[in-house]
């Protein structure tokens, strides 16, 4: 699937998808009017240290993916310190389940859902893939609806909070992680493990794309290397350290390469159509062996 200059993308903003107490979360929905359904769906999750920001960060990516034939959603999620782990993870899973339960009405294919995230968002989408259908982290939105993904992409993510906490705090501030996880590693070690995709990934992981900027001064590229190493025996993984800093996916000098690699990866694993071998639960580890899911 490729972008088309002649394609018009429509955006439906603030579609409610998750209600927690008195708080209603919304998503933005991007659809290309010139493309025919059913379309694979993509969930894009922004960063912000689990504490700041709102949907809209991925607007350019969403428009381009919509032009390439995807139905794209960019959801809100709950933020620290008002909400701690696993609240944001549950919200991302709710967005995935919304795609599966409601996406067909918008021209989406509920059997093909992918996700990409940056920074904190990368942690959330990769962790969502690693804990797919785990009752401990599933929303109450659509009981019985799967939160599994066909493929996932993480940009500049933190994937092992335990290793991150051991870094020199003068170089890498871990206070926001303690705020999100509810304390220090000594106080809540279980949260640091449960929130780390490195510790949660198993053979149910879908194919995964991991990119990290070589000059990232916020999250060290070693975090992505740890994730790639953990996934190596489990699933197909594409890992690369690319030019740029922490915000490389949004930098105009590097944007086209990131977009093209991502859409090519998603097309390979979710763009083949319903009933194909693309997606969660079918493809095995890189050696081509048959692995039960």
Predicted regions and their residues:
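Alpha/beta-hydrolase superfamily serine-hydrolase fold, recognizing
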Residues: 1-293
């Amino acid at each position: 699937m490729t972008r088309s200059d002649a394609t018009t993308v429509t955006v439906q903003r603030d579609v409610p998808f998750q209600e927690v107490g008195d708080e209603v979360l919304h998503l933005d929905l991007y659809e290309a009017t010139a493309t025919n359904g059913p379309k694979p769906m993509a969930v894009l999750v922004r960063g912000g240290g689990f504490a700041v920001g709102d949907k809209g960060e991925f607007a350019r990516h969403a428009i381009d993916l919509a032009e390439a034939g995807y139905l794209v959603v960019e959801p809100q999620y709950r933020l620290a310190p008002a909400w701690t782990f696993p609240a944001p993870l549950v919200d991302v899973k709710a967005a995935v389940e919304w795609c599966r339960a409601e996406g067909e009405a918008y021209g989406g294919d509920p059997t093909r859902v992918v996700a990409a995230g940056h920074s904190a968002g990368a942690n959330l989408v990769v962790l969502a893939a690693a804990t797919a259908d785990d009752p401990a982290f599933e929303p109450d939105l659509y009981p019985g609806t799967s939160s599994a993904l066909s493929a996932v992409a993480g940009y500049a993510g933190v994937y092992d909070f335990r290793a991150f906490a051991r870094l020199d705090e003068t170089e890498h501030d871990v206070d926001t992680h303690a705020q999100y996880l509810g304390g220090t590693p000594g106080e809540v070690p279980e949260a640091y493990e449960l929130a780390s995709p490195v510790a949660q990934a198993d053979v149910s992981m879908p194919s995964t794309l991991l990119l990290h900027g070589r000059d990232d001064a916020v999250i060290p590229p070693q975090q992505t290397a740890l994730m790639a190493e953990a996934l190596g025996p489990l699933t197909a993984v594409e890992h690369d350290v690319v030019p740029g800093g922490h915000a490389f996916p949004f930098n105009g000098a590097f944007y086209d390469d990131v977009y093209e690699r991502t859409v090519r990866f998603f097309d390979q694993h979710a763009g083949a159509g319903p009933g194909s071998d693309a997606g969660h639960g079918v493809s095995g580890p890189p050696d081509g062996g048959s692995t039960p899911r």
